[in-house]
């Protein structure tokens, strides 16, 4: 993005008018008078009449073709758009409302409020194309974001101001975990969250809005949606719209913000569609040649500045569970922590279905999390890894053929697996079990005691989907009373 575009964020230049010369699906070519072509990323408006209803279509400039022509991508269906229609240059990029006015409301990628039309248009607005923070503004200190979810805090701790990827195929719990994190941040830290729904189901967006309203966390959250049924231009820009709202809370109000993107794969997918429509040569597996660049433009803006941060939790759909696919592989490069949700663990009824052996965090090292945390985490991972290696022997010969030491390892691993599951606040109405927030110190102590064998006499059922050790003791007492 050029400096000129950065300067246009809040003030429009004198507008020029052009004419539509070609419409191919969501791609619209517009001719302007000589010397009056709009800048790249400028928003253009064109009025259309469809079935006696007037509406304004927003176009975004994507290419300068020469001969006074610009190629644009439509942010709405192009039904009713005809050659010769007048197009007006707004003189600035797509802009969205920012500030407290966006909390508790649902917006689209263009900044239009969906639940209260017209809201925020008379207040401050920021353009969605912005530069990342300068190097000297970045925060150098690394801090853990305590979530109260045992498996995350112990084995894949999140970085405050970092980027976290939730990887998994369809139906393993990515969206549920994001909803849970929104609830925890609002309840435990009174923090502000921004949710960007990128290319997901409209029904899920509606359900999320109603559930957040029911749980009392909606007033601390801004929601921006560009759903499955919308043109690729919208799905490609909605993440930037949500990020812009989050940047205002960080830079102007000095808040720590959580940005949720569901699903970052759909952002890549929309970019691929637009790239093809613009006539670019595809690269590996049919993705756009600018995949790494587009991902970098988004991810580099998500960071900590002096004393405040944007922490991003991004659901990443993995096509056919193939982690070598260019879309998830490109996302990996930007992440500070990865939480992989595993279908095999979900099939055991353990939620969140986090795979502790494949999930990672760059801050799980003694210098950042401390010696005790690191040692306990490594002991847990070693026990689970040893159990995995023994599964083939168990499947062929049975448990009886194992050494006594290996039998103990397998039994402890099974207890650890179940104890890594946890009751969620958002699942209360389905399970009837209240959600739990487990402090990090309690989590470390609990797993250390399990690894030491203090609970070897407890049945595995006593560890299912619970919070801390107090819940385990209560479950054990209940089982023995029977």
Curated annotation (Swiss-Prot):
Coiled coil: none annotated. Its EC number is 7.1.2.2. It comes from the Bacteria. ATP binds at residues 168-175. Pfam families: ATP-synt_ab, ATP-synt_ab_N, ATP-synt_VA_C. It catalyses: ATP + H2O + 4 H(+)(in) = ADP + phosphate + 5 H(+)(out). InterPro entries: AAA+_ATPase, ATP-synt_VA_C, ATP_synth_F1_bsu, ATPase_a/bsu_AS, ATPase_alpha/beta_chains, ATPase_F1/V1/A1_a/bsu_N, ATPase_F1/V1/A1_a/bsu_N_sf, ATPase_F1/V1/A1_a/bsu_nucl-bd. Its main location: membrane. One of its GO terms (molecular function) is proton-transporting ATP synthase activity, rotational mechanism. Keywords: ATP synthesis, ATP-binding, Cell membrane, CF(1), Hydrogen ion transport, Ion transport, Membrane, Nucleotide-binding, Translocase, Transport. It is a peripheral membrane protein. It is found in: Cell membrane. Gene3D superfamilies: 2.40.10.170, Bovine Mitochondrial F1-atpase, Atp Synthase Beta Chain, Chain D, domain 3, P-loop containing nucleotide triphosphate hydrolases. GO terms for cellular component: plasma membrane; proton-transporting ATP synthase complex. Produces ATP from ADP in the presence of a proton gradient across the membrane. The catalytic sites are hosted primarily by the beta subunits. HAMAP family: ATP_synth_beta_bact (MF_01347). F-type ATPases have 2 components, CF(1) - the catalytic core - and CF(0) - the membrane proton channel. CF(1) has five subunits: alpha(3), beta(3), gamma(1), delta(1), epsilon(1). CF(0) has three main subunits: a(1), b(2) and c(9-12). The alpha and beta chains form an alternating ring which encloses part of the gamma chain. CF(1) is attached to CF(0) by a central stalk formed by the gamma and epsilon chains, while a peripheral stalk is formed by the delta and b chains. Belongs to the ATPase alpha/beta chains family. This is ATP synthase subunit beta. It comes from Corynebacterium urealyticum (strain ATCC 43042 / DSM 7109). The gene is atpD.
């Amino acid at each position: 993005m050029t400096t000129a575009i950065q300067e246009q964020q809040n003030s429009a230049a004198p507008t020029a008018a052009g004419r539509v010369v070609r419409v191919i699906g969501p791609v619209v070519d517009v001719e302007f008078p000589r010397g009056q072509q709009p800048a790249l990323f400028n928003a253009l408006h064109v009025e259309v009449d469809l079935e006696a209803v007037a509406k304004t279509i927003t176009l975004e400039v994507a290419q300068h073709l020469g001969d006074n022509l610009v190629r644009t991508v439509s942010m709405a269906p192009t039904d009713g758009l005809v050659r010769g229609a007048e197009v007006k240059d707004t003189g600035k990029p797509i802009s969205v409302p920012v500030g407290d006015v966006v909390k508790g409301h649902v917006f689209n990628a263009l900044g239009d409020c969906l639940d209260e039309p017209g809201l925020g248009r008379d207040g401050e607005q920021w353009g969605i194309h912005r530069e990342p923070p300068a190097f000297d503004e970045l925060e150098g200190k690394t801090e853990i974001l305590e979530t109260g979810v045992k498996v995350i805090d112990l084995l894949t701790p999140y970085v405050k101001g970092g980027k976290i990827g939730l990887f998994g195929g369809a139906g393993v719990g990515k969206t549920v975990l994001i909803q849970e994190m929104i609830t925890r941040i609002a309840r435990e830290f009174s923090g502000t969250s921004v949710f960007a729904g990128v290319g997901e189901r409209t029904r899920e967006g509606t359900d999320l809005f109603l559930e957040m309203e029911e749980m009392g966390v909606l007033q601390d959250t801004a929601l921006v949606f560009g759903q499955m049924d919308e043109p690729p231009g919208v799905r490609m820009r909605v993440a930037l719209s949500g990020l812009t709202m989050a940047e205002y809370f960080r830079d102007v109000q000095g808040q720590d913000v959580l940005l949720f993107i569901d699903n970052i794969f759909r952002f890549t997918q929309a970019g691929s569609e637009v790239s093809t429509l613009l006539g670019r040569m595809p690269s590996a597996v049919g993705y756009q040649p600018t995949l790494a660049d587009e991902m970098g433009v988004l991810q580099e803006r998500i960071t900590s500045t002096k004393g405040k941060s944007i922490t991003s939790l991004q659901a990443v759909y993995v096509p056919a569970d193939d982690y070598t696919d260019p879309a998830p592989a490109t996302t990996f490069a930007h992440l500070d922590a990865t939480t992989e949700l595993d279908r095999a663990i979900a099939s055991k009824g353990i939620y969140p279905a986090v795979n502790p052996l494949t999930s990672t965090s760059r801050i799980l090292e003694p210098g950042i999390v401390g010696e005790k945390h690191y040692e306990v985490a490594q002991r847990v991972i070693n026990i689970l890894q040893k159990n995995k290696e023994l599964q083939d022997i168990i499947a062929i010969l049975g448990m009886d053929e194992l050494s006594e030491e290996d039998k103990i390892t397998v039994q402890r691993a099974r207890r650890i697996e179940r104890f890594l599951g946890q009751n969620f606040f958002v699942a209360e109405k389905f399970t009837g079990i209240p959600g739990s927030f487990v402090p990090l110190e309690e989590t470390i102590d609990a797993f250390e005691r399990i690894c030491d064998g203090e609970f070897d006499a407890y049945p595995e059922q006593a560890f299912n989907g619970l919070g801390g050790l107090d819940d385990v003791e209560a479950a054990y007492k209940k089982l023995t009373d029977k």
